[in-house]
Amino acid sequence: MARVTVEDCIDKVDNRFELVLLAGHRARQISQGAQITVPRDNDKNPVIALREIADETLSPDDLKEDLIHSLQKHVEVDEPEADGEVIADQTGAAVAATETDDAEDNITFDRMTEEDLLAGIEGLVPPEKSDDY
């Protein structure tokens, strides 16, 4: 196949900068083991990515969505909003359950005086020095 030029792809993706981003993202996907949709023909991954875009075997919109998704660090999930009354009922039930749990569990912790703490610290043995540093 002849060399893939920007002119072959520019009618599929209007912006040249976006084309570079999409082709780079697709080339990284290919490097990570994604299936290619055109014959390899001994070409490198960026050329294959451009050929896939030029031949329209991949949708630029799908590539763009995948690129955006790969760059997101926090994905917000749309959850259906509950009615105000349902939320109030759930909150009241949670408060009542918490009060009941507190009364049943009454967790106690051991108390330590400052002198006991200092005596424990003095009794600690320092770790042996090693040549790993």
UniProtKB/Swiss-Prot annotation:
Its Enzyme Commission number(s) read 2.7.7.6
Please verify whether the record's keywords include Cytoplasm.
Answer: no
UniProtKB keywords: DNA-directed RNA polymerase, Nucleotidyltransferase, Transcription, Transferase
Cite the SMART domains for this sequence: RNA_pol_Rpb6
Q: Which GO terms describe its molecular function?
A: DNA binding; DNA-directed RNA polymerase activity
* Gene Ontology CC entries for this record: DNA-directed RNA polymerase complex
Q: Name one GO biological process term.
A: DNA-templated transcription
Catalytically driven reaction(s)? RNA(n) + a ribonucleoside 5'-triphosphate = RNA(n+1) + diphosphate
Keyword Calcium listed: no
> What job does this protein perform?
Promotes RNA polymerase assembly. Latches the N- and C-terminal regions of the beta' subunit thereby facilitating its interaction with the beta and alpha subunits.
Q: Which NCBIfam families match?
A: rpoZ
Q: How does it assemble?
A: The RNAP catalytic core consists of 2 alpha, 1 beta, 1 beta' and 1 omega subunit. When a sigma factor is associated with the core the holoenzyme is formed, which can initiate transcription.
* Family (UniProt): Belongs to the RNA polymerase subunit omega family.
**What's the protein called, per UniProt?**
DNA-directed RNA polymerase subunit omega
